[in-house]
Amino acid sequence: MTANTKTHAMPDMKPQTTLDLNGLASPGPLPALRRTLRTVEEGQVLLLISDFPGIENDLHVWAKQTNHQVLFIDRTRPRGFGFFILKGDLWPVERSVDVTGSHCPTPVLEASKTMVQIRAGQNIKLVSDCQAAPLEVNTWIKTTGHKLLAMTEDSRGVYRFYIKK
């Protein structure tokens, strides 16, 4: 039997701000992270360095609740992990469609319904964890004439598609 493994090399990301909170005691890095993010613009990346126990799960829950995204986790640091966090959205969006937990073709079907509700030139954000979503969204874009502005994928495989009508 052969093990199926993926190697995730560190992407070429340039954070606008770095926040080193190694050694920080309770309540942990989230309050300091919130304060620092106030100085970061929408669509920019912050690098949080932390060795706080349980921070990875806390960050993912916090990011989902606050419309941020944990893009990548650098686990190669000598002390603590490096969390690359995208603040907010890359583009202004008129509507958000979150179909996380739904199987394909649900993302494209829901995006189609939402596009009917917005005007030409406006954007939607489609959030999906379906592994086939990138392929399906690209095919859908080509057949509908909409424009894919960007796609991001977080460290847990959740995609954000920014689509212009």
Regions from the language model: what does each represent?
Residues 2-165:
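Domain-level signature for proteins that mediate thiol-based redox and metal-cofactor handling
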